[in-house]
């Protein structure tokens, strides 16, 4: 297993996620997808180091991060659908007008 290739790929995925957030700050759906891409890059790091060091903790952390990411996606998409139904748009500049 070539560790440098996997870590480089993971770094590229993480940087693409950061770039997606900074490039498109108007659409919250793309921001959520970019955050998911960043979490997948972190998971890849956990899995690569888990295999490289022959330790199961990295795989357990990756499973935990996937669980949290799934919950975060479900809540984020639910808020997104409700916001679209109420406001008619998913632009980020109107999100701060939420009542709570």
UniProtKB/Swiss-Prot annotation:
Give the membrane topology, semicolon-separated if more than one: Multi-pass membrane protein
Write down a Pfam family by its short name: Oxidored_q2
The molecular function terms of the Gene Ontology recorded here are: NADH dehydrogenase (ubiquinone) activity
Locate the transmembrane regions by residue number: 3-23, 28-48, 62-82
Tell me which domain of life the UniProt entry assigns to the organism this sequence originates from: Eukaryota
* Intracellular or extracellular location(s): Mitochondrion membrane
Any single GO CC term annotated in Swiss-Prot or TrEMBL for this entry: mitochondrial membrane
* Broad class of where this protein is predominantly found: mitochondrion
A single GO BP annotation from the record? ATP synthesis coupled electron transport
Q: Could you say which EC number(s) this protein's record lists?
A: 7.1.1.2
Annotated catalysed reactions? a ubiquinone + NADH + 5 H(+)(in) = a ubiquinol + NAD(+) + 4 H(+)(out)
What the entry lists under InterPro entries is as follows: NADH_UbQ_OxRdtase_chain4L/K (IPR001133), NUOK/Mnh_C1-like (IPR039428)
Per UniProt, the keywords (alphabetical) are: Electron transport, Membrane, Mitochondrion, NAD, Respiratory chain, Translocase, Transmembrane, Transmembrane helix, Transport, Ubiquinone
| Record's function text | Core subunit of the mitochondrial membrane respiratory chain NADH dehydrogenase (Complex I) that is believed to belong to the minimal assembly required for catalysis. Complex I functions in the transfer of electrons from NADH to the respiratory chain. The immediate electron acceptor for the enzyme is believed to be ubiquinone.
| Protein family according to the UniProt entry | Belongs to the complex I subunit 4L family.
Q: How does it assemble?
A: Complex I is composed of about 45 different subunits.
Q: Entry's PANTHER family?
A: NADH DEHYDROGENASE SUBUNIT 4L-RELATED, NADH-UBIQUINONE OXIDOREDUCTASE SUBUNIT ND4L
The protein depicted here goes by the name NADH-ubiquinone oxidoreductase chain 4L
């Amino acid at each position: 297993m070539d560790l440098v290739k996997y870590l480089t790929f993971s770094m590229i995925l993480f940087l693409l996620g950061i770039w997606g957030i900074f490039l498109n700050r108007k659409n919250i759906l793309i921001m959520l997808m970019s955050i998911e891409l960043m979490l997948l890059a972190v998971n890849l790091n956990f899995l690569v180091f888990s295999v490289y060091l022959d330790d199961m903790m990295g795989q357990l952390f990756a499973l935990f991060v996937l669980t949290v990411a799934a919950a975060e996606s479900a809540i984020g998409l639910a808020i997104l659908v409700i916001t679209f139904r109420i406001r008619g748009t998913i632009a980020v500049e109107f999100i701060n007008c939420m009542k709570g």
